[in-house]
Amino acid sequence: MKIFCSRANPTTGSVEWLEEDEHYDYHQEIARSSYADMLHDKDRNVKYYQGIRAAVSRVKDRGQKALVLDIGTGTGLLSMMAVTAGADFCYAIEVFKPMADAAVKIVEKNGFSDKIKVINKHSTEVTVGPEGDMPCRANILVTELFDTELIGEGALPSYEHAHRHLVEENCEAVPHRATVYAQLVESGRMWSWNKLFPIHVQTSLGEQVIVPPVDVESCPGAPSVCDIQLNQVSPADFTVLSDVLPMFSIDFSKQVSSSAACHSRRFEPLTSGRAQVVLSWWDIEMDPEGKIKCTMAPFWAHSDPEEMQWRDHWMQCVYFLPQEEPVVQGSALYLVAHHDDYCVWYSLQRTSPEKNERVRQMRPVCDCQAHLLWNRPRFGEINDQDRTDRYVQALRTVLKPDSVCLCVSDGSLLSVLAHHLGVEQVFTVESSAASHKLLRKIFKANHLEDKINIIEKRPELLTNEDLQGRKVSLLLGEPFFTTSLLPWHNLYFWYVRTAVDQHLGPGAMVMPQAASLHAVVVEFRDLWRIRSPCGDCEGFDVHIMDDMIKRALDFRESREAEPHPLWEYPCRSLSEPWQILTFDFQQPVPLQPLCAEGTVELRRPGQSHAAVLWMEYHLTPECTLSTGLLEPADPEGGCCWNPHCKQAVYFFSPAPDPRALLGGPRTVSYAVEFHPDTGDIIMEFRHADTPD
């Protein structure tokens, strides 16, 4: 059955009605899931298998039947491990119906249907009794309910319910225990993801400083965790202020509480500095003795950094203290971890928490609007002084004292730069109430509330009255729009430029003057795993899962790129970067499609996993800003990516076999089309079997 769905087009700005298959959201969830990544996580799978074997043995040694409850079974992998280890029966719970259906097929294909019952329910809906889903309580609890924050997927309420209703008292649990660790650091780079710094503007009248409003400075920030591949943050980007501190542990074999709690650790700072950021991760022990351990520790805290398992479904956490605080080497402090049923946050206390009534504080929430409008990469981008200097340099070449400037970007400070550089009149368009409110506060904090005109409406709806009867001599954009997911979605600026054409005066300038779409073929060190078939996992056939993911990708996304922040995912360029399409912002959006096709030669040996695409914005003929590669690749092909933007990754299909020799295809063919009527960029990249 087909259904109609409305969708806001991020490129054209229009709302469209699309005919979709009724299961399109299932396909999308599967295509973008981490199932493949988990199946490729060898360390996780081996440790779970070892822990399950040990738990089944302990139960059998007591002369009991081994009855397993597997919550969040996914493919059924852990249940199949349990049966292979000697479990008498497994109840495998999976709430996501397409996944539960796949688990039934995988279990059947591997010959375990007589000992594994897949139950398509949330675990809190499972019943026990003669007429229930389970005839009796289980005595082994196996789960994989964890996310990067450990408890963010509802592990605590699920465990709490399971112990009360589904498993025996003092049951065996795999994992047996989890421990959360934290380390206090000073980091200007990471702090710039959470706070608005003063921005310096060099003008003919000297340096001007754009200061943040007081409530933005004092705001604790967004409540959500910042999860990243912490191993890709250079040690030069932070100063360690504390040892690694075990903050709290959860024993999963006993009753678990989802109630809010706090846990403190006394420590003495290793050096004096500014406490800004808490780095955090966890480990899980699969057995009561703690001999079978799976850790998310970054390389500097890992027991064997040379043998670390790469994974993307579990990473590390960055937490921001509400305010930076000075710390003195050797002067004792208390780091406090707070959590409710789904979230963790941290605070720093000068006195023992038992003596401090403030310690049981509420979860921090943004009350300044900035953290609701700007995500963490956007904060970093706005705080990038070099980037600001590039805009100032470009603006100087196009501004005149009598310029009338219209700025179009979400929550951008370009209007302030234009004013400080001497523009006669500046208008900025903010289509959302949140960005309008935030910019008004920033303007007031800098005494500009009467100098810059904010227009709260969609730019396509501008009237002569909005512009006070003036014609625009400079249309200005970063461009940046909060609805953009892929690099070319910011081509919305081009559609705005077309819509406001009637308001542009003779000889009006547009900045950026143009944009171009670029690409490079790469070999990923690890990211390829998220789209690579698994086939066999610890001796179990999971081809059905591979096929399910492939069908989901073929349904919608096989010919689409997906956004990834590639500074977190090292890769080597195998080709030279090349320009695919150009977009002339000096002219309105054309009526006819823009097309490009050709082949590119691979210059370096390697497994070509994907084509990476990004936009470059040509502010002026002499000044270009890249959202992708920032400099030429090093001799080995190493890439340096813009850390504030996500790049578009088009994975080749079929994925290269990692066991294959490196003498694969030496060319890649491509065909790319930009369709002005929809704003879509349709693309296809594929290996070409060209002989050497």
From Swiss-Prot:
Task: State any GO BP term from the record.
Answer: spliceosomal snRNP assembly
Enumerate the subcellular locations listed in this protein's record, separating them with semicolons: Cytoplasm, Cytosol; Nucleus
Please give the Pfam families that the UniProt record associates with this protein. Answer: PrmA (PF06325), PRMT_C (PF22528)
The principal location of this protein is cytoplasm
One example of the protein's molecular function in GO is: protein-arginine omega-N monomethyltransferase activity
> Which EC number applies?
2.1.1.321
Q: Does the keyword Oxidoreductase apply?
A: no
InterPro entries found in the cross-reference section: Arg_MeTrfase, MeTrfase_PRMT7, PRMT_dom, SAM-dependent_MTases_sf
> Which residues does the record list as Omega-N-methylarginine (modified residue)?
32
Q: Which UniProt keywords apply?
A: Chromatin regulator, Cytoplasm, Differentiation, Disease variant, Dwarfism, Intellectual disability, Methylation, Methyltransferase, Nucleus, Repeat, S-adenosyl-L-methionine, Transcription, Transcription regulation, Transferase
Instruction: Report which reactions are catalysed by this protein.
Output: L-arginyl-[protein] + S-adenosyl-L-methionine = N(omega)-methyl-L-arginyl-[protein] + S-adenosyl-L-homocysteine + H(+)
Q: Quaternary state and partners of this protein?
A: Homodimer and heterodimer. Interacts with CTCFL. Interacts with PRMT5 and SNRPD3.
Family statement: Belongs to the class I-like SAM-binding methyltransferase superfamily. Protein arginine N-methyltransferase family. PRMT7 subfamily.
> Implicated in which disease?
Short stature, brachydactyly, impaired intellectual developmental, and seizures: An autosomal recessive disease characterized by developmental delay, learning disabilities, mild intellectual disability, delayed speech, and skeletal abnormalities. Skeletal features include short stature, brachydactyly, and short metacarpals and metatarsals.
What this protein is reported to do is described as: Arginine methyltransferase that can both catalyze the formation of omega-N monomethylarginine (MMA) and symmetrical dimethylarginine (sDMA), with a preference for the formation of MMA. Specifically mediates the symmetrical dimethylation of arginine residues in the small nuclear ribonucleoproteins Sm D1 (SNRPD1) and Sm D3 (SNRPD3); such methylation being required for the assembly and biogenesis of snRNP core particles. Specifically mediates the symmetric dimethylation of histone H4 'Arg-3' to form H4R3me2s.
Protein name per Swiss-Prot or TrEMBL: Protein arginine N-methyltransferase 7
Where does this protein come from, organism-wise?
Homo sapiens
